[in-house]
């Protein structure tokens, strides 16, 4: 819409300094869908809070963060604010993975000019749709006196209401006036009220206040000498954590009236958020991140080797695991550890072809029998196919993924100049992958790392590189026995059981969830705190909602320290905006 005129109307927001000044927080939410649902009585809230046999250790919490919202969070923001009928386009390239999570990478990421260009294209498209004839009557709360002229009052009403959700806090009078002025100037020039409003809205959608979460601290009245997140920052941190999107109007109201800063108020809010249908999207986002499912974006198999493995298979494999996670952890409120031994899952026609099962239309629940080698997430296509090569399986990649993704145990990279030709050649003199790995391990330089990964990965040789079950490799029996940190097993089901009982499995999840919720990687100083959350997790039967509640209700979740260099980081983050504005003003 009127793209040639945009240079006359700067679309960049009013300055990153205002985000620090007013404490830009959390992320958006339901402009069209207000409120939460869930338990409301004090008895239910008290019951949900759950008493513990352990006391939370003293902690200064995490540093107040400045971080870029992820692509998915940005699109969720727009979707929850303007409704499902707005076409949001596709996700942007992911951020860098840091300590196991893309979300952690957001705490260290800035935005480049190229990324800003992507945001701008999405913002322009969304803003144009919001004001078009199909949407304006139910998204814009007023009508201009004339569609061919500026109406500052109507523009201000809409931009103030939308801006509260987009910026995750109320706009100042100055910000409202600046946005309305921008809309009015553009409308007068273009002789089109809605075109001017779209330009002002587009500026909001790519402003630093929208794209960056800048957490603000305030003195903690309950702990003299310590600081806590201010109310709007806490609302945002909770909303990103549990919903992977920003606070809706009800949550912002709870921040405005101070309820969110009281123990009873926060307990009520957390329980309502955990009972909301929006929790599913938040849990999906976390496990999609933890399981490194962004690897699906580049997953491809050799069609000559795996002709039944298609692009539909790729999408459905990801969806199968996420459906299994939601069903087990949220619907059934099951033990997290049992995800790795469960026989219950869901199948689509494309997956049925790889699982070698009869296909039924659409998605259907499926229960593998007790004598099946399919037990838990390790035996699903999402794990087996992603952690393989395009034309063959890889015990090393699978064992490495098990260690790093599920047990939080980093595996060192291979030393330089290692000859992998032996294990990469399926046509060598060695009959099976185990034989090839054993021969490769005769090189002492290689043995150290492979002993960390391959005893588990070789058990998964029961499945080929696409995830299909097999008992032989080129006519030779496959030996699926192995060990996991001293626990011996005879087959892949035994591996699943050994993983299920490994003490690092729940503790790894705890560390990942706390990092995800606090907006950045944990530190060695968090050791006692993580131990406390582990105990709470165990006491509550390893239920995932219980873990989310324990973290969200902790003092550490809201306690913050003021990091050094925040102003410098803010200035660096703002630099691309200044350059972008200069380029578009020419």
Predicted features and spans:
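Bacterial Sec signal peptide processing site at the extreme N-terminus
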Residues: 38-49
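Sec-dependent signal peptide hydrophobic core
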Residues: 20-27
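N-terminal secretory signal peptides that target proteins for export/translocation
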Residues: 1-18
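Active-site substrate-binding loop specific to GH73 endo-beta-N-acetylglucosaminidase modules
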Residues: 37, 52-53, 79-517, 526-544, ...
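Surface-exposed beta-strand-to-loop junctions
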Residues: 55-57
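C-terminal motif of bacterial Sec signal peptides marking the signal peptidase cleavage site
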Residues: 33-35
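Mature N-terminal segment immediately following signal peptide/propeptide cleavage
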Residues: 60-90
């Amino acid at each position: 819409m009127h793209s040639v005129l945009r240079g006359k109307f700067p679309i960049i927001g009013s300055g990153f300094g205002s985000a620090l000044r007013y404490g830009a927080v959390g992320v958006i939410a339901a402009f069209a869908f207000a409120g939460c649902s869930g338990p409301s009585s004090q008895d239910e809230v008290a019951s949900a809070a759950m008493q513990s046999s352990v006391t939370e250790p003293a902690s200064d919490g995490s540093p107040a963060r400045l971080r870029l919202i992820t692509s998915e969070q940005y699109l969720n923001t727009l979707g929850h604010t303007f409704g499902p009928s707005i076409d949001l386009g596709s996700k942007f390239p992911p951020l860098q993975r840091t300590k196991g999570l893309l979300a952690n990478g957001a705490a260290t990421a800035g935005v480049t000019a190229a990324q800003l260009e992507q945001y701008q294209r999405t913002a322009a498209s969304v803003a144009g749709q919001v004001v078009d004839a199909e949407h304006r009557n139910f998204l814009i709360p007023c009508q201009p006196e004339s569609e061919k002229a500026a109406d500052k009052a109507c523009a201000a009403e809409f931009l103030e209401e939308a801006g509260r959700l987009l910026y995750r806090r109320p706009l100042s009078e100055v910000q409202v006036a600046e946005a309305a002025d921008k809309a009015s100037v553009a409308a007068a020039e273009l002789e089109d009220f809605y075109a001017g409003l779209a330009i002002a809205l587009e500026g909001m959608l790519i402003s630093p206040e929208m794209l960056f979460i800048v957490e603000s601290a305030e003195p903690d009245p309950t702990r003299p000498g310590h600081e806590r997140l201010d109310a709007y920052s806490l609302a945002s941190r909770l909303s990103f954590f549990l919903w992977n999107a920003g606070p809706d109007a009800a949550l912002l109201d709870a921040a405005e009236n101070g309820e969110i800063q009281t123990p009873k108020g926060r307990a009520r809010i957390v329980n309502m958020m955990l009972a909301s249908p929006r929790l599913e999207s938040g849990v999906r986002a976390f496990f999609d991140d933890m399981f490194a499912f962004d690897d699906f974006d580049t997953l491809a198999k050799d069609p000559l080797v795996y002709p039944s493995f298609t692009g539909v298979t790729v999408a459905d494999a990801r969806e199968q695991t996420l459906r299994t996670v939601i069903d087990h952890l949220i619907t059934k409120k099951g033990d997290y550890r049992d995800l790795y031994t469960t026989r219950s899952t869901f199948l689509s026609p494309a997956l049925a072809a790889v699982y070698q099962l009869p296909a039924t239309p659409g998605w259907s629940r499926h229960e593998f029998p007790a004598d099946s080698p399919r037990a838990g997430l390790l035996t699903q296509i999402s794990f087996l196919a992603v952690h393989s090569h395009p034309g063959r399986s890889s015990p090393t990649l699978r064992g490495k993924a098990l260690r790093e993704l599920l047990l939080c145990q980093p595996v060192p990279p291979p030393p330089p100049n290692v000859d992998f030709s032996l294990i990469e050649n399926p046509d060598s003199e060695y009959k099976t992958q185990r034989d090839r790995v054993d021969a490769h391990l005769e090189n002492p330089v290689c043995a150290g790392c492979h002993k960390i990964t391959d005893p588990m990965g070789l058990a998964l040789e029961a499945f080929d590189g696409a995830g299909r079950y097999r008992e032989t490799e080129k006519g030779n029996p496959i030996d699926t026995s192995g060990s996991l940190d001293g626990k011996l097993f005879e087959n892949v089901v035994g591996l699943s059981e050994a993983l299920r009982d490994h003490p690092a499995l729940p503790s790894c999840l705890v560390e990942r969830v706390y990092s995800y919720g606090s907006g950045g990687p944990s530190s060695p100083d968090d050791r006692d705190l993580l131990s406390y959350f582990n105990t709470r997790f165990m006491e509550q039967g390893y239920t995932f909602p219980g873990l989310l509640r324990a973290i969200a209700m902790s003092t550490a979740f809201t306690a913050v320290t003021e990091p050094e260099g925040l102003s410098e980081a803010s200035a660096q983050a703002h630099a691309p905006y200044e350059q972008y504005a200069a380029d578009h003003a020419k």
